[in-house]
Amino acid sequence: MACGATLKRTIEFDPLLSPAASPKRRRCAPLSPSGPSPQKYLRLEPSPFGEVSPRLTAEQILYNIKQEYKRMQKRRHLESSFQPTDPCCSSEGQPQTFIPSGPTLPGTSATSPLRKEQPLFSLRQVGMICERLLKEREDNVREEYEEILTTKLAEQYDAFVKFTHDQIMRRFGEQPASYVS
């Protein structure tokens, strides 16, 4: 004969009578770590990424855009600047980005009717330039990150080898090495 014993649950555990409580099993509250918090470790050692070059300045961005423009001209992605275009629409049907080609004279404004400004880049071309610049910047960051990781890994490996050697020397001391031990 099978004998079974059951215990009646108290009201606080009954999910039907206590709608505020979840019918699922309660989880234990996480214990506070006895060791130092991760924030403490972050404060102890300066970040290796603090040494990374700062954000690009406006001059660097302008220089990079000019370099990319020259590359695109070499690849013949840009139309000839002498070809007349309607300033409101490009040949691709996209709006143009207006970039003044030089400084304006003190007596004239940027919207002066003396000179009809033609757009230098289409929206698509600006997108291509920005994409290329972002890719180059990402590649630089990846290279720096890989160098830092490789250095840190080499340091950890050296520390591990030294620790292992010290443990072996402490355990066996000056005993001659044997195949049995």
UniProtKB/Swiss-Prot annotation:
The keyword Repressor applies. Keywords: Developmental protein, Nucleus, Protein transport, Repressor, Transcription, Transcription regulation, Transport. Residues 18-48 are annotated as: Disordered. GO terms for molecular function: protein-macromolecule adaptor activity; transcription coregulator activity. One of its GO terms (cellular component) is nucleus. It is found in: Nucleus. It comes from the Eukaryota. Belongs to the akirin family. Homodimer. Interacts with actl6a/baf53a. Interacts with gmnn. Molecular adapter that acts as a bridge between a variety of multiprotein complexes, and which is involved in embryonic development, immunity, myogenesis and brain development. Plays a key role in nuclear protein degradation by promoting import of proteasomes into the nucleus: acts by bridging fully assembled 20S proteasomes with nuclear import receptor ipo9. Involved in both neural precursor maintenance and terminal neural differentiation: bridges gmnn and actl6a/baf53a in neural progenitor cells, antagonizing the activity of gmnn, thereby suppressing sox2 expression. This is Akirin-2. It comes from Xenopus laevis (African clawed frog).
